[in-house]
Amino acid sequence: MPDIVAARRVGAMRLGRAELLSDLFNEAPVSIGVAGTSGKSTTTGMIGWILKATGCDPTVMNGAVMTNFVSPDEPFASSLVGNSGIFVSEVDESDGSIARYTPTVAVVNNVSLDHKSMDELRALFRDYVAKAKVAVLNLDNAETVALLVGARKAITYSLSNPSADLLAHDVRARTRWNLLRTDLTRRRGVRGE
């Protein structure tokens, strides 16, 4: 590849995608990393959309097209460049690059057998959660419940566990692709930060 040869010739640094992305993410004043063995892209897109719709102007890096951001100019909208200092990114465990991230907020949807052994996955997610200022954890998945022990501060969510900080109920899908309506109950003492 001519570009790599030219870069070597001038001594330019060469970074892989995970290295570059984690460096940018870790430098952000507020970083929200979305992890889990499934649902990362959808959750990243939802968080990005909520932040954008509420005027927060986030930067978002996703592993899939974010339907709400698709336009004629951006048909493959898997990223969004904002100007607020908030960086939302899908964080991947399959290649171990999750270990490179130090999030302000670590969201973990679920942990299940995928790409690595359960022991490896538990260690990766445990270390990821331990580095975050706040962990957002799904109480409907036993493996994410186990991550509570290592979290500095945790906010929990659930579709069925009434002890969760945030409990979604009466979930209704309106269309096949991108409209979901739910009622959310917040437990007393959980601030809306």
Segments predicted by a language model, with ranges:
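Phosphate-binding loop of NTP-binding sites
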Residues: M1-K153, D183-R191
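Active-site loops of AMP-binding adenylate-forming
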Residues: V65-M66, N161-S163
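A cyclin-like helical interaction fold
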Residues: F125, S158-S160
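Ser/Thr- and Asn-enriched, surface-exposed coil loops between beta-strands
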Residues: P162, R174-R176
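A conserved short coil-to-beta-strand element within the FAD-binding core of flavoproteins
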Residues: V171
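Short aromatic-glycine-enriched beta-strand elements
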Residues: N178-R181
